[in-house]
Regions:
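Acidic, Mg2+-coordinating active-site environments of NTP-dependent enzymes
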Residues: 2-157, 233-237
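Short acidic, glycine/serine/threonine-rich loops at helix termini
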Residues: 1-2, 54-56, 199, 278-280
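ATP-dependent carboxylate-amine ligase
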Residues: 62-64, 97, 117-143, 147-284
C-alpha cells in the first residue's frame, strides 16, 4: 500500500532469472511494470528496450507521464550535446520549465541517462531548477564509478556495482571511450547458485573487452568459488583476453594492480561499496 510520487523506468535486461528468482524474462518484466500501479507519475526512458510496452503499462496506471531521452527531442526531458570537460561531463537539457547546461562530476558518460531520470523526477515533484543543478553537480554514490588513480595517473582503478549484461556492456563502452588506448584488467565473479545466465554474459563481455580477466569470489554462498569461476572462464576464453582464477578477492585485486606495467584501467565490479562476502550461510 505504499504510494509513490514518481516511479522511474530506466532500463530492462535479462537478469534475476533462476530457480530462486524469476522463472523467465516475461515474469521479471511484468514484475517491474507493477510499480506504476502505485505511482502518481511515471518517468519513462524512451531510449530503453521495450519502451513502447513500458509506456503502455504506465498510461494504464499513472495519471501523469514524463518521458526522458537522449535521442528523441519530443521527450519531456531531452538531453543533448554531451561532452567531457576535464574530469566533468557537460550536457544540455530541455524541459517544459527551462533549457540549460548541466554538469556532472561523477565519472561515466552513461550517467547522463541517470541524470535525465533524476531530472524527470524533479519535474514530477516540482524541484526548482537551481536545486536540480546543484544536486546533480554534487551527486556521488558509494560504489558507483568510484575512480582511484596513482600519482602519475597511469593506473586508474574503477569500483562499480556492474553485475549483469546491461551494466557490463555500458561500463565497458564508457571506459573504452573515456580511456582510449588503455589496457583493461577486469576483476569480478558471480554469485553462487543463482542468476546462472550472468556467468555466460559477463564471461563473454569481459573476454571481448578486457586484456586480462581475473575471476574471483562474489558472494559464492555454498557453491565452491572455483566451480563458479570455471563456469565463467569457458566464456571468457571465447574472447581475446587472458584470464586467471584467484578465489580470494583481496589477492585477486592485488594481482591486478601488480600486473600494471603500462597505462591501465582496472575494473573492480560487482561488489561496489560492499564490505562483506557471503561464504557458506554467513556474511564475512
Amino acid at each position: 500500500n505504499v504510494e509513490f510520487a514518481a516511479a522511474v523506468f530506466l532500463n530492462i535486461g535479462m537478469d534475476h532469472i533462476s530457480p530462486i528468482e524469476h522463472p523467465d524474462f516475461e515474469d521479471y518484466f511484468a514484475s517491474k511494470l507493477r510499480i506504476f500501479a502505485q505511482a502518481a507519475a511515471a518517468c519513462v526512458n524512451l531510449d530503453c528496450d521495450h519502451a513502447d510496452r513500458v509506456l503502455e503499462a504506465a498510461r494504464k496506471s499513472c495519471p501523469r507521464i514524463i518521458t526522458f531521452s537522449q535521442t528523441d527531442p519530443s521527450a519531456t526531458i531531452f538531453g543533448s550535446q554531451v561532452r567531457k570537460a576535464g574530469g566533468d561531463i557537460l550536457f544540455r537539457v530541455k524541459t517544459p520549465r527551462y533549457s540549460r547546461e548541466f554538469r556532472l562530476t561523477m565519472p561515466g558518460l552513461f550517467n547522463v541517462q541517470n541524470a535525465l531520470a533524476a531530472l524527470a523526477v524533479c519535474e514530477a515533484v516540482g524541484v526548482p531548477e537551481q536545486y536540480a543543478f546543484a544536486g546533480l553537480m554534487k551527486a556521488r554514490v558509494p560504489g558507483r564509478m568510484e575512480v582511484y588513480a596513482n600519482a602519475d595517473e597511469k593506473v586508474s582503478v574503477i569500483v562499480d556495482y556492474a553485475h549483469n549484461r546491461l551494466s557490463f556492456e555500458t561500463l565497458f563502452r564508457s571506459v573504452r571511450e573515456e580511456y582510449p588506448g588503455r589496457r583493461i584488467v577486469t576483476v569480478f565473479g558471480c554469485p553462487g547458485y543463482k542468476a546462472y545466465d550472468r556467468r555466460k554474459d559477463l564471461g563473454e563481455i569481459s573476454g571481448q573487452y578486457s586484456d586480462l580477466v581475473i575471476l574471483t569470489e562474489e558472494d559464492p554462498g555454498e557453491e565452491p568459488v572455483e566451480n563458479i569461476c570455471r563456469d565463467i572462464a569457458q566464456y571468457v576464453a571465447q574472447g581475446s583476453s587472458d584470464y586467471s582464477i584467484v578465489p580470494d578477492r583481496g589477492e585477486a585485486i592485488k594481482q591486478a594492480v601488480m600486473s600494471c606495467d603500462e597505462p591501465t584501467v582496472i575494473l573492480l565490479t560487482g561488489k561496489g561499496a560492499e564490505t562483506r562476502q557471503k561464504r557458506g550461510i554467513e556474511y564475512i
